[in-house]
Amino acid sequence: MKTICMMRDLYKALAEFEAQFEKEYDLSLNEAMILCALQEAKEEMTSTALSARTGMAASHTSKVIRAVEEKELIKRALGKTDKRQMYFSLTPKGKERLKELNLEKVEVPERLKGVISGLDKG
């Protein structure tokens, strides 16, 4: 039971962080994860690759992609060899937006600080 209670506390802390993050940056964490994945890849990615990289379900990834496209932070292009395949990349506005993300502006709940510092070590 202790593990479930700890997971509940982590979930609540993450929800609190996400609300603060979205208020500060006008981006959901999922939208930010799409931008981060594209930045780390340093090349165009398919929605399938973005889904795998972020851990989101394919249907949810499509919704998030549409949201960041509407904000003009990413763009889509047809595949060069397979015109049915779509590839996504950061726009200049998206790259600039990533530079603006300063997490010091958003208070990370204590419960998450330990988890985050543990991930940095791995």
Located regions from the model:
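Amphipathic, well-ordered alpha-helical segments in soluble domains
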Residues: 10-13, 30, 64, 104
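N-terminal leader segment of winged-helix/HTH proteins
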Residues: 1-25, 72-73
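Short amphipathic alpha-helical segments with heptad-repeat character
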Residues: 4, 8-11, 55, 95-102, ...
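Charged, amphipathic alpha-helical coiled-coil/dimerization segments
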Residues: 66-122
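Surface-exposed, interaction-prone regions with an acidic/low-complexity signature
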Residues: 1-5, 58, 111-116
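N-terminal helix-turn-helix DNA-binding core of bacterial DNA-binding proteins
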Residues: 17-57
